[in-house]
Amino acid sequence: MTTTPIRFGRDIPDDAELRLCGDLNHAKRALELGVSRHRNALAMAQAGARAIAVDPDLAKLDDLRARAVELELPVQGHHGDLADLGFATSGSIDLVVADHSLVTVDDLGRLLRQVHRVMKSSRPFVISVPHPFAGVYTTDQYGSKVHPYGTVGRTVGDWFIHLARANFRVDQILELGVSETSPVPTTLVLRAVKEGD
């Protein structure tokens, strides 16, 4: 079976190129926070990890489970709020990936504290979100309208502050998606590592 790499968004490089997640094997546990369109929990399981996914949308979990059965991959699914990680013991997760699933989270601090609790120290937490600068300029039927930076989604600085307050250290920031059709980045990818215990 061909191993599918973990993906962080549409039309941007995947983890085979970016190498943000590290090696996964049978001894490692990996968590997908919010089932993404790429169903990264399947890629985690294909790589040999004990894959877990949590999502408040039961339909997404059912779709993930059906695909896992079809591919004969062991994937554990949990229905609930993204911050409800009580199923995982403290310090038990080696990798957490959130592919465009944290955009609408209201209490980001609570979620980050829970992710910090379940992760092993010095392990990666990879977050991808729409790049905050991509929402600055839009066009409507009356002409151009400019949205000030920070009025559409969290800014890069907001992400750094929230992650630092939850005791994560950002060690990589990637601004991806610049192309002939998009002069500004479309996707912001952050890799943070857990500090402390």
What are these regions (language model features)?
Residues 83, 87-96:
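A short acidic, Gly/Pro-enriched loop at the edge of an enzyme's catalytic core
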Residues 166-168, 182-197:
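Core SAM-dependent methyltransferase catalytic element
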Residues 2-28:
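Conserved alpha-helix/loop element of class I SAM-dependent methyltransferases that forms part
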Residues 94-109:
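A short SAM/SAH-binding and catalytic strip from SAM-dependent methyltransferases
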Residues 109-124:
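A short glycine-rich, Lys/Arg-flanked "PGG" loop and its adjoining helix->strand segment in the class I
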Residues 124-151:
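Conserved class I S-adenosyl-L-methionine
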Residues 152-173:
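Short alpha-helix
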Residues 29-84:
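Class I SAM-dependent methyltransferase SAM/SAH-binding core
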